[in-house]
Each structure stands twice: as C-alpha cells, then as structure tokens.
Amino acid sequence: MSTSHTKLELALDLQIATDNKQLPTQQDFELWVRTALRNTMTEAELTVRVVDAEESQALNSTYRGKDKPTNVLSFPFEAPAEIELPLLGDLIICASVVEHEAIQQNKPLQAHWAHMVVHGCLHLLGYDHINDIEAEEMESIETQLIESLGFNNPYKEQ
C-alpha cells in the first residue's frame, strides 16, 4: 500500500453533526483527503461535515432539487480571480446513507467512507461524471486512489 504524498499543508475542519457512532477518525479523513489531493496542490483548507439524513435531504433538496438524502455533496469554494486562498470547499457526507450503501453494495464500511471522501474531493478539484467520458476519467482516478489506500476497486461488484 503506497501512501507517499507530495508535502501538503492540510487544514481539515471535521464537523460531526450526527449521533452515528460508526464514524472514521480524524486521521482517517485526513489520510483520505491527502490521498485525493496528492500532487495537485501544496496547501489546502476544507471542511468535511458528517450529517444525519435530515440535514443531507434538506441540502440536497435546496442545492440539487432532489428531495432525498444523498451520500456526499461537494461545495467548491470559488474565490475571485485576484484572491489566492487555499480554501478548497466543503464536503457534506451523510453517515446513514454511506452505511446503507456499504451494506447494499457488500463493501467494507471503511472502504466506502474512503471512496466517498475521495469522490467528494475530486468534485472539489473540478472533476465530474455528467457524461460518459467524464465519468470514465473520474472513476479511473478514484479507482487508482482507492486501491493505493489498500481498498478494492469501488466500481467492481464485490
């Protein structure tokens, strides 16, 4: 398992807004964020907020027009061109949806958490999966990053 990284100064604000007890540690989140951002920047600030289904559903409804909770929402920070800030943005991750999906997809919970963090960070970096070409590129990068963490390809049937 390769975890070598370009030196990244990371300021990660982890906010826990759920009663769920099966959550990764601060160190887990930092490792996954560092892995997703490796070789892309030298300094980054972001917030990861772990929420319950109610908050996820409200945000998903407001910002995506979908009235249901979702696994991860990404909110990139867009600074004016003349301002240089290392602020990447915010990830909102719904603990109960991540747990449900891990069970449904027969994946280890920790592996699915890692995948959701990496997936969200790639969105913050500007990757998307709206069309097939973008989806293939994003999935390929995700798979490489997840496998470098010692987890299985998240898109393969388990």
UniProtKB/Swiss-Prot annotation:
GO cellular component labels: cytoplasm
Enzyme class: hydrolase
Coiled-coil ranges per UniProt: none
Subcellular location: Cytoplasm
EC number: 3.1.-.-
GO MF terms, alphabetically ordered: metalloendopeptidase activity; RNA endonuclease activity; zinc ion binding
Family affiliation: Belongs to the endoribonuclease YbeY family.
Organism of this sequence: Shewanella woodyi (strain ATCC 51908 / MS32)
Ligand binding (Zn(2+)): 119, 123, 129
UniProt entry keywords in alphabetical sequence: Cytoplasm, Endonuclease, Hydrolase, Metal-binding, Nuclease, Ribosome biogenesis, rRNA processing, Zinc
Superkingdom: Bacteria
Alphabetical GO biological process terms: rRNA processing
PROSITE patterns in UniProt: UPF0054
Pfam families cross-referenced by the UniProt entry: YbeY (PF02130)
General function of this protein: Single strand-specific metallo-endoribonuclease involved in late-stage 70S ribosome quality control and in maturation of the 3' terminus of the 16S rRNA.
Protein's name according to its UniProt entry: Endoribonuclease YbeY
Cofactor field: Zn(2+)
Cofactor note: Binds 1 zinc ion.
